[in-house]
Amino acid sequence: MGHRTRMILVLTLVVMSIWGSDASAMQKTKFDAPLLTEKIATNRSIIVDIEGKGDYTSVQKAIDAVPVGNSNWIIVHVRKGIYKERVHIPENKPFIFMRGNGKGKTVIESSQSSVDNVASATFKVEANHFVAFGISIRNDAPVGMAFTSENQSVAAFVAADKVAFYHCAFYSLHNTLFDNKGRHYYHECYIQGSIDFIFGRATSIFNNCEIFVISDKRVKPYGSITAHHRESAEEKTGYVFIRGKVYGIDEVYLGRAKGPYSRVIFAKTYLSKTVVPDGWTNWSYHGSTQNLYHGEYKCHGPGAERQKRSDWAKDLTKQEVESFLSIDFIDGTSWLPVWLQEKF
């Protein structure tokens, strides 16, 4: 059996729309800008061009131009360039599709550290129904700031429901992605950081994402990729990483406990030797580990060895993990323009 055939058997690509299914779209294997534009189906657009060949030269000015209480999709096309600004999508401006020209081509960056995570963010999403494609978001705060009290340097703060990022990249040294609340979908994104660089209380699927670990000399012995905060069993939240890979230039934990019911799962993910043997830590959390839900399912690579895993770390079965790998974990069939459904 060839590699292509095996992949078809393992994965079922589901490309649907909240406005109805499309049989021809289901054959597509790439979630690109034309497909998303087709599914979002709007002719309302604003063009941002740093060279002055569009409607605005600033991303924030384009957002400001979206009507308050917007109830229909509008495309904000941010053409290639490095936009040195901080961007805020306020709560009263939902249904925005921010379309870049590709991560590495369309870049939004600032250099801001703060004692407060939200205050430091380069990019803030507080409006429901937000979709982004092909954009890099950076917080380039100097490394030296890491040794002061103003050491938070968030790239993106996501505090809204029904938010999706496709082929985007997030860069910072510390606390890169504040995935705060709501249902979120990250597809083939790149996320770089060192300490707690994906953190918050959200309900999120990270599908085929690259997690790159960089060095931070503040941390002895290691930093952590995730710090998911969950206070009770009733909270239907958690971070689920499906496929993708974890690699980098420093050692790291997959996650640390943040609250007694912290929930993070890595499934079918390549774990390089960057991942330390313990895998998980309760660093700074001094309560019981009984209700922590830190688990792995069919991960592979040198960092996936389980002999020395933390006592509470779970080696999940198919039955235990199946509901988390379903797009229904984030109710995605009702709001995502396109998604990938994992099949066993």
Curated annotation (Swiss-Prot):
Reactions the enzyme catalyzes: [(1->4)-alpha-D-galacturonosyl methyl ester](n) + n H2O = [(1->4)-alpha-D-galacturonosyl](n) + n methanol + n H(+)
Domain of life, source organism: Eukaryota
InterPro entries linked to this entry: Pectin_lyas_fold (IPR012334), Pectin_lyase_fold/virulence (IPR011050), Pectinesterase_Asp_AS (IPR033131), Pectinesterase_cat (IPR000070)
Keyword Cell wall biogenesis/degradation: yes
A single Gene Ontology CC term: extracellular region
EC number: 3.1.1.11
Biological process, per Gene Ontology: cell wall modification; pectin catabolic process
Tissues/organs with expression: Expressed in flower buds.
Molecular function in Gene Ontology: pectinesterase activity
Signal sequence bounds: 1-23
Subcellular location: Secreted, Cell wall
Function recorded in the entry: Acts in the modification of cell walls via demethylesterification of cell wall pectin.
Family according to the record: Belongs to the pectinesterase family.
Name of the featured protein: Probable pectinesterase 67
Gene source species: Arabidopsis thaliana
